[in-house]
Regions:
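Amphipathic alpha-helical transducer elements in NTP-driven molecular machines
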Residues: 53, 115, 119, 148-152, ...
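The Walker A/P-loop phosphate-binding site
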Residues: 29-127, 132, 355
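Phosphate-binding/switch region of NTP-binding enzymes
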Residues: 67-68, 73, 78, 165, ...
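C-terminal regions of RecA-like/P-loop NTPase motor modules
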Residues: 159-160, 236-355
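CheY-like receiver
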Residues: 59, 153-157, 191, 295
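Short, small/acidic-rich helices and loops at N termini and domain boundaries
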Residues: 1-35
Length: 355
């Protein structure tokens, strides 16, 4: 066995030291501290399991590992702080979201910024919604080593302060830069899962824009229960940014429609909700259905070819998306060929509409 092999190896170095008994004590000590999972549960004993819950709906699912990813310089860290303020103060920072009735402290583990920067962001976000600062709501810890190296220390901190959500900014530094190593990424997910709280990891997108999920191995995508991507457009010299947040993965519910914002900077910071992206750059990165819907809002009764030209996609891609959502999002005219398509919400105003 492995234990016998260790004993023989140790005896070659130092004989007659009672290695068998010593290794038994080591095994007992390890078993007492190493987490191997929760207690066994008979699922039939769980009565009336609750529906999916959120720390901040729809961005952060309660008790799960959530990821928000974006390119560098897209205000993703500011959005992370907005999630912390929403959750811990119980107030809506970003329109279109909702917050729990029982706020708890947030722990912000930061590899990329400073306590002064994060305190300023928190203060400006609170000023933007007219809320006074309170102590003990958002706890901050500057990090330097990978999370798994400090997992036990952090667990003690989380438990002692009643923390309900942990934000890790960013995932790349939290695994020591080894984003493409499963030997680092999987232990990271295991470590934070052992804390038993809601997790939000901030991650970077890969340089290849066609890749799915954060930069690194597929486990970033596979292990996330809820995954959003943030897309930004800004005119140089302006004190506002246009943003859209696209929902790419949901393990427990259907995908949410993209949410768009105008983020205004000044003495305070405010998120203003938008019905649709005002930036063509942002719109081009939204789901095909969103692009088609936006086109038909402005140009109803359009053919597939007209839509395809308008959104710069192939006829086949547009036709497949429309057929998939016919009667749900779109309705077509009665012609057998070259049907003209409009939004289903406009059907009441069109007496000639035939599904």
């Amino acid at each position: 066995s492995n234990t016998d092999g260790h004993i023989r190896s140790l005896n070659r170095r130092m004989k007659d030291r009672g290695w068998d008994a010593r290794l038994t004590l080591v095994e007992q000590s390890l078993n007492s501290v190493v987490e191997i999972g929760d207690d066994l549960v008979d699922l039939s004993t769980i009565e009336n399991p609750p529906p999916v819950q959120y720390a901040v709906w729809p961005f952060v699912e309660y008790g799960e590992h959530n990821i928000i990813a974006a390119d560098g310089g897209t205000t993703k860290s500011l959005m992370a702080m907005a999630m912390a303020v929403s959750y811990s103060y119980g107030k809506i920072v970003m329109p279109g979201t909702s917050v729990p009735l029982d706020p708890k402290p947030t722990l912000y583990l930061d590899y990329e910024s400073s306590s002064a920067t994060q305190a300023r962001r928190r203060r400006q976000l609170l000023a933007g919604i007219g809320i006074a600062e309170e102590a003990g709501k958002i706890l901050y810890k500057r990090m330097y080593s990978p999370v798994q190296d400090a997992a036990t220390e952090l667990y003690d901190l989380i438990a002692s302060r009643g923390v309900g959500m942990v934000i890790i900014d960013s995932g790349a530094r939290a695994v020591g830069g080894e984003t493409s190593s499963e030997e680092m990424v999987i232990p990271y997910f295991n470590a934070v899962a052992s804390w038993g709280v809601t997790i939000l990891t901030i991650a970077h997108k890969p340089k290849d824009s066609t890749s799915r999920g954060p930069a690194g191995v597929a486990q970033w995508w596979n292990q996330a229960r809820n995954y959003w991507e943030l897309v930004k457009d800004q005119t140089p010299g302006q004190n506002e940014v246009h943003l859209s947040v696209r929902h790419d993965k949901a393990n427990d519910e259907s995908l949410h429609v993209p949410l768009s914002y105008r983020l205004a900077f000044g003495e305070d910071i405010r998120y203003h909700g938008l019905d649709t992206p005002v930036s063509t750059n942002i719109m081009s990165q939204m789901p095909i259905s969103t692009q088609i819907t936006n086109f038909l809002l402005n140009s109803p009764q359009s053919t597939v070819k007209e839509i395809a030209i308008g959104i710069e996609r192939s006829d086949k891609v547009v036709d497949n998306e429309i057929r998939k959502n016919e009667g749900k999002l779109y309705y077509g005219s009665k012609e057998a060929y070259n049907r003209r398509w409009s939004l289903i919400e406009d059907k009441k105003e069109d007496p000639w509409a035939i599904l």
